[in-house]
Amino acid sequence: MFAGSETTFTSDFPHKHPHLEEDRQVRLERWATGTRFTHDFRSRSNYFRNASFRRDIPSVKLSPLKTGGIVLAHMQRSIGLLSLTFVAISGILGSGWLFAPLMAAQAAGPSSLIAWMIGGFAMLLLAATFAEIAAILPVAGGIGRVPHFSHGSVVSMTMGWTAWVGYNTTATIEVEAVLRYSKSLAPWLYGSDGLLSPAGLAVACVLLAVFTVLNAFGVRFFARLNTALTWVKILVPAGLAAVILTSEFRYANFSEYGGFAPEGLKGILSAISTGGVIFALIGFRHVIDMAGEARNPKVNVPLALVISLVVCLLIYGGLQLAFLGALDQSQLKQGWAALSFPGELGPMAALATAVGALWIVSILDSSARISSFASALVSVGSNARLGLAMAQNGLFPKFMETLSARGVPLFALLINFVVSALFFFILPFNEVLALNTSSIVLSFVVGPVAVLAFRQLMADAPRAFVLPAAPVTGCLAFVVASLIIYWSGWDTMLHLGVCLVIGFLLMIYRNSRGGFDSLDWREAAWLAPYLAGLVLISWLGSFGGGAGYLPVGPDIAVVSALAVAVYILAVRLRLRQDKFDLYMAEEKADERMEYGDGA
């Protein structure tokens, strides 16, 4: 689309609205002269309110990019397949492998193995929908940006906001994991109540600042550093699982102490949402957000998503199996729910000590910090791209679109640093963990909807990966994502609801001057019944502080029915082709600014 000495844009503005075509010309000329722009909601509002859409439209000629001697920074498509895959693996193999086997076992006992299977299936479904999307629309901050092209401003702002909140909690969680595994070296990091001391809070903020600075060096430096760290993150947990499995394995643990599923179906489902399973596996999302900086994204993004999830599922499955089989009778005499490791060692290191593999304990101690360090590094970098996307959507101030000389959204990095640091002070660790899972999964529900929307809106686009049986597979993915949100419980839904209200108020404020007609309300009509239904069912249910009026089993049927109905509605409420074409024209202009002549 951008070739030769001139760039041609096809304008979506009808001939009979010349004043709107003139406004469009002004906005495109601002781009051509090096002035970044975000969407002018007022002009778009007038256009979509008054225009009768036609496809017989003129072309607008633009001269080459001129900057008046100022060198513009560009984003860099420099992440190859290995680095992209390792970005996802680093996100998945963060602090999750250190704590998730214990948390899942506490919730479900030996049936936690089933929880990993269900969770892995759910994440593969969601990843498959985004694999097709990212291959045809590889944009930076994809989780927040993709909905803009399928369902418009309100949906993209809502989903991007919830993802942004969740991403900021990820950095908080991983930093605290680093500190928890450093407690033996620096006991002053924590107070007698088990919470971070004032000195510990200061160190946590300094660590966040370090991750911010490292990401500011650019995506190429970030990718190389993460790749080196991720080799350690793969080899150590895989080696630990092999060592424990070959040292001692007690088959009785799978039948005694309450049986294979001591908490029944509810325990399995709780392990998926609040037992660390989804928190661990959802790290694949970073590939979607880094897709805008990937080489050959049409091929590399789908491959990275699938490879990373399969590799990490094998590692997590091995760790969980080893953990369950290595526990001795004294640790299980009070039941799975009371299982704990009160010493300074984490659960995996404690088990390695118990089976006599003392040589690996010191390796685990260092690897634990490296794993969390690398995951925090990835989450900070990924969230900066999401902040950039939210500025492009219009929810965040446009200064957050500014790129540094290394092509990094520097202001987005700095704002995210402040917000992530605040979570250390306002919520306890377990509530931050629950909010992380539910908010990020909520932002993912748009994937199954968008994949069908783009089958209509981008029907002729070549697809390196095609989701098989998309209507059925997409619907199933939407149902599974909805169930995961519900299983997080009523208490978490309350926190998520507060975050959504704050995001909605911010959206109203940001668009109060430009009018609200441009916000694609029709395309967002499915959000209100969906969110209200989830909140109501969560209150009626028995998970996480619910009233208990809706027992386990029937509640799954109710959530599934809600999800299917909303899914059908959401697919029908996709953007009209006219709006989609306009948004894509603006995106192409943005790409030329972000990536230079190679876009």
Kindly give the residue locations of the regions a language model identified.
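Terminal cytosolic tails of multi-pass membrane transporters
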Residues: 31, 39, 44, 48-78, ...
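Loop-to-transmembrane helix boundary motifs in multi-pass membrane proteins
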Residues: 76, 81, 199-205, 295-298, ...
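Extracellular loop-to-transmembrane helix junctions
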Residues: 76-79, 89, 99-199, 203, ...
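Hydrophobic, membrane-embedded alpha-helices of multi-pass small-molecule transporters
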Residues: 79, 83-96, 204-207, 244, ...
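Membrane-helix boundary/coupling elements in multi-pass transport proteins
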Residues: 139, 162-177, 281, 285-294, ...
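TM-loop-TM module centered on a large, flexible mid-protein loop between adjacent transmembrane helices
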Residues: 145-148, 152, 183-190, 260, ...
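Hydrophobic alpha-helical segments and their helix-loop junctions in multi-pass secondary transporters
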Residues: 185, 231-259, 280, 320-329, ...
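Membrane-interface loop-to-helix entry segments
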Residues: 199-249, 282, 305-309, 436-445, ...
